[in-house]
Regions:
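N-terminal Rossmann-like dinucleotide-binding module
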Residues: 1-19
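Predominantly a Rossmann-like dinucleotide-binding segment in NAD(P)-dependent oxidoreductases
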Residues: 94-167
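Contiguous beta-strand/loop segments that form the cofactor/metal-binding neighborhood of enzyme cores
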Residues: 155-228
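C-terminal helical cap and adjacent loop that interface with cofactors, partners, or active-site loops
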Residues: 225, 235-249
Length: 249
C-alpha cells in the first residue's frame, strides 16, 4: 500500500500502476490498517511524528535518514519500539555493505590511525531556486533541511560505525538564510582527528581517506554507496577491493 499527499496523488497513482501496488490513500491512519511495516520517506521534520504514530500502532518502521531531528527524539522512538516489541530501522545501509566491512578488516594494517577525511559534496538541483529566493524543503531550516542533515549524516555514520562515538564534535557551517548549505564537522578521538565535509552549494569528487602510520585506505565514492576500496601500504603493493557486486567502483 502507498500513502501520499493529495498534491502528489497523480505521481502515487503512477507508482502503484508501475509496481503493482493494490492500495493507495492520502490518509496515514488508513494506511496503518493495511500494512505490517511502514517505510517513511517524508521531510526530515516529520520523521519523529510519523514514526511514533506507526510504532504506537504496533508497526515495524523503516525511517529515512536522519531517524529524527534530535537525540532525545531518537531515544524516545527506540524506547517505544522496544516496549511495543517491533523493529525500528534507519534506512542507511552503509554499515551492512561488504566494502565497508572490508575497510573495517583493513584498519589494523594501516597501523595507528592519525587522520580521517570524508567528503560528500554534490551541487543540489534545488540550490539555484534557493538562491533565487525560494525555500525548497531541503533548504528549509523549519523542515530540518541543510547539508548536515541531508548529506553529512552519511559521513558521520561511516566514521562512527568504524571508530565509535567521538570525544568532541565541532561543526563549522556555511550559512545562507538560516540554513547550512555546506559545512565541515570535526570529530576528536583519543589519538586521531576526523574531518567530515558535505556540501549542497558546490560539488567535488567523493573522497574518503583513513590515514595511519603504516599506510592509508582510499575510497572514491560516497558513503552510501561505499564503492571500490584501495589499501595503500607504506611499503609493498597497493591492493584494490570491490565486494559490493554491481555497485559502482
Amino acid at each position: 500500500a502507498l500513502c501520499s499527499t493529495q498534491r502528489s496523488a497523480p505521481v502515487a497513482d503512477e507508482m502503484c500502476e508501475q509496481y503493482g501496488i493494490p492500495q493507495r490513500t492520502t490518509n496515514y491512519f488508513e494506511l496503518l490498517q493495511w500494512v505490517d511495516v511502514i517505510y517513511l520517506a517524508v521531510p526530515n521534520l516529520q520523521h519523529y511524528r510519523y514514526a511514533k504514530v506507526a510504532l504506537e500502532a504496533g508497526k515495524h518502521v523503516i525511517v529515512e535518514k536522519p531517524m529524527a531531528c534530535t537525540a532525545a527524539q531518537t531515544e524516545e522512538l527506540a524506547a517505544l519500539a522496544r516496549r511495543k516489541k517491533v523493529f525500528l530501522f534507519e534506512a542507511m545501509t552503509t554499515q551492512y555493505l561488504e566494502n565497508y566491512n572490508k575497510i573495517r578488516e583493513l584498519l589494523p594494517r594501516i597501523g595507528r590511525v592519525k587522520l580521517v577525511q570524508c567528503n560528500f559534496s554534490q551541487y543540489s538541483s534545488r540550490y539555484d531556486a534557493f538562491c533565487a529566493g525560494e525555500t525548497p524543503v531541503s533548504f528549509d531550516p523549519e523542515c530540518a533541511g541543510g547539508a548536515l542533515m541531508d548529506l553529512n549524516v552519511y559521513n558521520i555514520s561511516y566514521i562512527v560505525g568504524l571508530f565509535g562515538e567521538p570525544n568532541q564534535v565541532h561543526y563549522l557551517p556555511n550559512m545562507e538564510r538560516g540554513i547550512d548549505t555546506s559545512g565541515i564537522l570535526t570529530m576528536e578521538y583519543n589519538s586521531f582527528k576526523a574531518v567530515s565535509m558535505a556540501a549542497k552549494d558546490c560539488g567535488a569528487p567523493a573522497r574518503y581517506v583513513i590515514q595511519g602510520t603504516k599506510g592509508y585506505i582510499l575510497q572514491k565514492s560516497t558513503a552510501n554507496w561505499c564503492g571500490g576500496v584501495t589499501f595503500h601500504p607504506n611499503q609493498g603493493k597497493e591492493e584494490h577491493f570491490n565486494l559490493n557486486g554491481g555497485r559502482p567502483q
